[in-house]
Amino acid sequence: MEETGAVFRKELVSKLLHLHFKDKKTKVSGDALQLVAELLKIFVVEAAIRSVRQAQAEGLAHVDVEQLEKVLPQLLLDF
């Protein structure tokens, strides 16, 4: 299967996960890293889409931080 668009590197995902593990010896399998990377990608794309819709609803031509801040609470609840 060929990847299209941006992806999160496994090293980055691993680093992000390990920053929040209490036990520094915790290991994450390659498959788990791949799944978390895909979840992050879906989350970011969904945040972008919702931010664009929010900007359009406000009659704006560009998305700004304010639109992202408005959609994040519901996005977090949906995930």
Curated annotation (Swiss-Prot):
GO molecular function annotations of the record: double-stranded DNA binding
Family annotation (Gene3D superfamilies): 1.20.5.4980, 6.10.130.30
Family statement drawn from the similarity comment of this UniProt entry: Belongs to the CENP-X/MHF2 family.
Quaternary context: Heterodimer with CENPX, sometimes called MHF; this interaction stabilizes both partners. MHF heterodimers can assemble to form tetrameric structures. MHF also coassemble with CENPT-CENPW heterodimers at centromeres to form the tetrameric CENP-T-W-S-X complex. Forms a discrete complex with FANCM and CENPX, called FANCM-MHF; this interaction, probably mediated by direct binding between CENPS and FANCM, leads to synergistic activation of double-stranded DNA binding and strongly stimulates FANCM-mediated DNA remodeling.
Assigned keywords, A-Z: Acetylation, Cell cycle, Cell division, Centromere, Chromosome, DNA damage, DNA repair, DNA-binding, Kinetochore, Mitosis, Nucleus
Location in or out of the cell: Nucleus; Chromosome, Centromere; Chromosome, Centromere, Kinetochore
Organism of derivation: Bos taurus (Bovine)
Function: DNA-binding component of the Fanconi anemia (FA) core complex. Required for the normal activation of the FA pathway, leading to monoubiquitination of the FANCI-FANCD2 complex in response to DNA damage, cellular resistance to DNA cross-linking drugs, and prevention of chromosomal breakage. In complex with CENPS (MHF heterodimer), crucial cofactor for FANCM in both binding and ATP-dependent remodeling of DNA. Stabilizes FANCM. In complex with CENPS and FANCM (but not other FANC proteins), rapidly recruited to blocked forks and promotes gene conversion at blocked replication forks.
Domain of life: Eukaryota
GO CC annotation terms, alphabetical: chromatin; FANCM-MHF complex; Fanconi anaemia nuclear complex; inner kinetochore
Chain positions with N-acetylmethionine modification: 1
Protein name: Centromere protein X
InterPro entries in alphabetical order: CENP-X
UniProt main location, coarse: nucleus
GO biological process, any: cell division
